[in-house]
Amino acid sequence: MFKCVGMRDVTRTLIRDWNACDLMNKRCIVHYRGRVQGVGFRFTAVRQSKGLSVHGYVKNESDGSVLMDVEGGTADVAELLRRIEMEMSGNIDSINLDERQPQNRDGGLVIRY
């Protein structure tokens, strides 16, 4: 599990630890904390996933955080995290990222209620 105080730390860690040319699927459970509910965070995540081969869901949690369960190729998952960082960094106070076994899902990234 990675515990970071900002997306830049997570993105750098992923790029360092994952081979960006690795064609294997990666799956991450990401908890975003901060001012992440009521600001379009989930919709931004889905919009930023367009054009990437990533699958999973993003949803609000009862504790005020947002959970994203995403999987796809290494480069696409890292790119999605980077895109979210670029647009939402002012809202993110901290994140927890836990790498999991891929489930080979399809259907893109969707909002789960």
Positions of predicted regions on the chain:
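Intrinsically disordered, low-complexity, mixed-charge
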Residues: 2-113
